[in-house]
From Swiss-Prot:
Molecular function GO terms recorded: calcium ion binding
Additional free-text comment from the UniProt record: This chain binds calcium.
Residue stretches making up the EF-hand domain: 16-51, 85-120
SUPFAM superfamilies cross-referenced by the UniProt entry: EF-hand (SSF47473)
PROSITE patterns linked: EF_HAND_1 (PS00018), EF_HAND_2 (PS50222)
Pfam family, one: EF-hand_7
Keyword annotations of the record: Calcium, Metal-binding, Motor protein, Muscle protein, Myosin, Repeat
Lineage of source species: Eukaryota, Metazoa, Spiralia, Lophotrochozoa, Mollusca
GO cellular component term, pick one: myosin complex
Protein name per the record: Myosin regulatory light chain, striated adductor muscle
Residues annotated for Ca(2+) binding in this entry: D29, D31, D33, D40
Annotated source species: Argopecten irradians (Bay scallop)
Role this protein plays: In molluscan muscle, calcium regulation is associated with myosin rather than with actin. Muscle myosin contains two types of light chains: the catalytic light chain, essential for ATPase activity, and the regulatory light chain, a calcium-binding protein responsible for Ca(2+) dependent binding and Ca(2+) dependent Mg-ATPase activity.
Length: 157
């Protein structure tokens, strides 16, 4: 039953949103095994400046009826993407790679991460993801990008 619900999400979500979720999943899947584990969530949370305890981590993963692969991740978190703070969450995921706090990342670095982490993006997926992305001078503006994919039209947080 969970598999049916999870696969149904793929037909309901816009392709852009699925691509963004794939990118988020890849960033969270720290050990690159195709599944988000308690250790992955702990590592990403610590990088974002928050250290949840084991009880919190267990509660986060409890929503999944089994191992949290990409399809299950989509099923559980896609509803949260339409909420008011989802854009902030996406920006924060990008921001963890933005050591200079410029709100821009080297596009080649982002592409390298997506090609070599978790759900390795192929060339077509990469082209689709960045087709209309705000890139200027080799810098990817993740604030504009998240506003664009979320449809908020806002360029600043």
């Amino acid at each position: 039953m969970a598999d049916k619900a999870a696969s149904g999400v793929l037909t309901k979500l816009p392709q852009k949103q699925i691509q963004e979720m794939k990118e988020a999943f890849s960033m969270i899947d720290v050990d690159r095994d195709g599944f988000v584990s308690k250790e992955d969530i702990k590592a990403i949370s610590e990088q974002l400046g928050r250290a949840p305890d084991d009880k919190e981590l267990t509660a986060m993963l409890k929503e999944a009826p089994g191992p949290l692969n990409f399809t299950m991740f989509l099923s559980i978190f896609s509803d949260k993407l339409s909420g008011t703070d989802s854009e902030e969450t996406i920006r924060n995921a990008f921001a963890m790679f933005d050591e200079q706090e410029t709100k821009k990342l080297n596009i080649e670095y982002i592409k390298d991460l997506l090609e070599n982490m978790g759900d390795n993006f192929n060339k077509d997926e990469m082209r689709m993801t960045f087709k209309e992305a705000p890139v200027e001078g080799g810098k990817f503006d993740y604030v504009k990008f998240t506003a664009m994919i979320k449809g908020s039209g806002e360029e600043e947080a």
